[in-house]
């Protein structure tokens, strides 16, 4: 693949600074850190660094984003390059009251919509589930949250979630359900699975989905990250939110940044599975 670089940032002069900065949602940071580590071996004279926290937008050279993200605060960025996909799964705390209420239930897309969203326009054939009314939904309010993608997958807006909104990174959603026995949320695969063991992170439990029997075990608490990635790359159930993830550069970025982007396309995508992302198809 080629970026087809013919813009000013590919043709312009190098900047004086040898440091380039990247901002990323937490779910993609381990992958970005791997890119930085590997790219340094090919061009040691240029350093790429992850920006933690809010950071100054003017100081950011590259931004990891996804297709449904609200880019209202990224007007100075363009030339987005998609390198993979993230999947989002509903979760609760293992052995919690919410897990007990949902035990044995295999939720289809309509039931998931009823569980997570305000019920003003549900289909007539979707019976009301009283157990759902007891459950507290936690969703992210940050612009980099997967909440918008999750909502759009079910034909909803992020403003339609039931329950409580959590500011900050989506990893805090895991903390929220750990503290609330009735809490249910959703998160990207790399926030749900341990990237080393490839199993669910300690204390988490997947909400059961209405999937074919040969797939159901992989989406249970006994499943592995690699099982899930393989299944989702061969088919995309309506119950699972999948969103393209890309990297975009600032309009003032220089040739060093363009070389890094080209390297990501040619070499960086081979690390997608290792860090919990699907490959593009």
Language-model segments: which ranges?
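A short, hydrophobic beta-strand-centered structural micro-motif
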Residues: 64-66, 184
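Extended substrate-binding grooves/exosites of carbohydrate-active enzymes
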Residues: 60
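Exported/periplasmic ABC-transporter solute-binding proteins
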Residues: 4, 8-44, 53-57, 79-81, ...
